[in-house]
Regions:
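Conserved active-site-proximal phosphate/metal-binding subdomains
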Residues: 52-66, 72-214
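Alpha/beta enzyme core
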Residues: 1-66, 73-92, 171
Length: 214
């Protein structure tokens, strides 16, 4: 019912999908383009990686596909195009932009992250979320493994994102971030982030041309 309302209002609709079946249903419902988001992403995720998901989605539908999850530099952006995407949705690398209005502690936590600094909570509850590891995630995962009921798990995480974004609580807050956090080393203006992404594409493409395939 929402799709019809949005389309009637002239709104372009770009749903996020985590699988080919959902992509086909949303195409039939009238979506204008689809965002194929892999499980490398921060926040709520599916189970397929971007590498596996994007080509399956673009092969399943006639709509343009946008890749999301695990994209923070020119190498990853070019890979998204190679997988069949017409563009990319960025998330984690924009958290550490100057313009992003999250708490400075949140940004600092993202910049300190390594390749193994994220974890996924909520799988047992049926709502997996990728976030940075902290005291809250350790306690939550213990609670989850103990067989706690869904309502108890929901109460445990209530207000977690607010604590991260507004209060800067890096131990009890829900610091949503993707696996590319380990690539991010400094806070930059949005303009610089996008300019560097695009400026690096020719060199990456040339590197592929020059590379000897063994």
């Amino acid at each position: 019912k929402y799709m019809e309302m949005w389309k009637a209002a002239g709104i372009k609709v770009a749903p996020v999908v985590s699988g080919a079946a959902l992509a086909r249903r949303l195409e039939q419902a009238g979506a204008d383009l689809l965002i194929a988001e892999g499980c490398e992403s921060g926040g709520h995720i599916g189970e397929l990686t971007t590498m596996a998901l994007v080509p399956q989605v673009v092969d399943a539908v006639q709509l343009p596909g946008v890749a999301a999850g695990g994209i923070a530099d020119s190498r990853q952006l070019l890979a998204a195009f190679a997988l069949g995407a017409v563009g990319a949705q960025l998330g984690t690398c924009l958290l550490v932009s100057e313009e992003c209005p999250i708490h400075a502690n949140y940004k600092e936590a993202v910049l300190k992250a390594r390749d193994n600094s994220t974890t996924v909570t909520g799988r047992i509850a049926g709502a997996p979320v990728r976030i940075l590891k902290n005291a809250m995630t350790r306690d939550y995962l213990k609670l989850e493994k103990s067989g706690a009921e869904l309502l108890e798990l929901e109460k445990f995480t209530l207000g977690g994102l607010r604590r991260a974004v507004f209060d800067g609580d890096v131990q009890r807050g829900s610091l949503m971030a993707g696996q590319v956090a380990g690539l991010l080393k400094e806070i930059k203006p949005l303009r610089q982030i996008f300019e560097e992404l695009m400026a690096g594409l020719p060199a990456v493409a040339q590197g592929l041309t020059d590379k000897k395939i063994i």
